[in-house]
Amino acid sequence: HRLIRRQRQMCIRDSTWGTPYYLKPIKLGFDMSIVSATKYYSGHSDVMGGSLAVSKKVFSKVKAAERITGLRLGPDDAYLITRGLRTLDVRLDRHRENSEKVAKFLSRFKNIKLLYPYKKGSYNYKMWKKYYSGASGLMGLKIKCKNISSVRKFVNSLKLFGYGYSWGGFESLVLHQEHREIGTRKFFKLAKDEHLVRLHIGLEDPSDLIADIKQALKHLK
């Protein structure tokens, strides 16, 4: 943040994961906070849109750019996002509670490393605890497994998780991040026998989700 200030550049933060409910970037000194309204804001995966919150210092510049580009959100999307925002706090707290229970279950398995800040010693916990007031439903699993087909079977055998790239809606989703490129695997610090699976924990009963994951884990060999 200080380095960016010295370079006289704008400091921008993508706040989609925690939303402003759990993280307030402008109060931390950021110039802009971007959120994909397609996700938690709407909450039903039926909207295309985004939001941009800015500091007073850059407001006039952003307003001028907005007038030039003429970007506008459609009335139907605006209505659905506004409706979703009314229940954002209730939904996010449920996502967090469900995710903590799922994370606690998954932490038992030595072949799975959780990429989720749910307790002391977990991934990025110190930084998360310093700036965030809560965690959302998106998490990553580093699965240690020599056979990639076993990972695919694990993903495909999940019955309560839809397969999809987006997230932030009411439903639970899974995505197998098949990184075959050497550079990408290096970025995620994946060993040859490690595979990345992304889970979004939705609003379903957490005991049902855990039972579903448990039956799917038997495919990991």
Question: What does each of the following model-derived ranges do?
Answer:
Residues 16-20:
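Short acidic loop-to-helix transition motifs that present clustered carboxylates
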Residues 1-12:
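Single conserved hydrophobic/aromatic residue that forms the stacking wall/gate
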Residues 13-15, 33-36, 75, 114-116, ...:
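General beta-strand structural signal in soluble alpha/beta enzymes
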Residues 26-80, 84-88:
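Active-site PLP attachment segment
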Residues 81-90, 137-145, 197-202:
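Short, well-ordered beta-strand elements within core beta-sheets of diverse protein domains
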Residues 100-159, 163-168, 184-188:
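Conserved small-domain helix->loop->beta segment predominantly found in fold-type I
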